[in-house]
Design a protein with these regions (language model features):
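GST-like fold's C-terminal all-alpha helical module
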Residues: 3-123
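C-terminal helix/juxtamembrane-tail motif
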Residues: 124-144
């Protein structure tokens, strides 16, 4: 379930936002996606719709994790999985990279501020020595 959520979030939220951020407004680029975020009303409506989708998706995951007795400190218990790392990557991309300031602006800050369980899991993943050494400041230095 958790890997699926991350894949869904990446495909339907992050990837279409990336098109907006990079200015890939040509139909060629948008046709490569599973959905065409800009087809129904341009950039502003696309951002509004993707913001709503982000909220719905993150609230669904937060509710599922908060109601799970096994989601501590990681999504499925005491061991960090690939899904935890994928979640960490998705969340930190939104929270720290320059381009996703578009989404942060829609929330007046952190788009995951109402998701304490997701935040806790990401903190745990980030505290893993190998993750911290590998990631360093890459998210905050990334322009997109």
């Amino acid at each position: 379930m958790y890997w699926s959520w991350c894949q869904d979030y990446y495909s339907f939220v992050l990837s279409p936002f990336h098109d907006i951020i990079t200015g890939h407004n040509e139909p060629f680029w948008r046709s490569l996606r599973l959905t065409d975020t800009l087809a129904e009303g341009g950039k502003e409506l696309g951002i509004k719709n993707l913001t709503t989708l982000h909220t719905n998706r993150s609230n669904m995951l937060e509710k599922n994790l908060a109601g799970s007795s096994s989601a501590k400190p990681f999504m499925t218990g005491s061991s960090c999985s690939y899904a935890d790392i994928f979640l960490y990557t998705c969340v930190r991309t939104v929270q720290e990279t320059g381009g996703f300031g578009i989404l942060r602006d829609e929330f007046g800050g952190d788009p995951f501020k109402d998701c304490p369980t997701i935040a806790s899991i990401c903190s745990e993943v980030g505290s893993i020595n190998e993750v911290g050494q590998t990631v360093g400041s890459k998210f905050s230095e990334c322009p997109i």
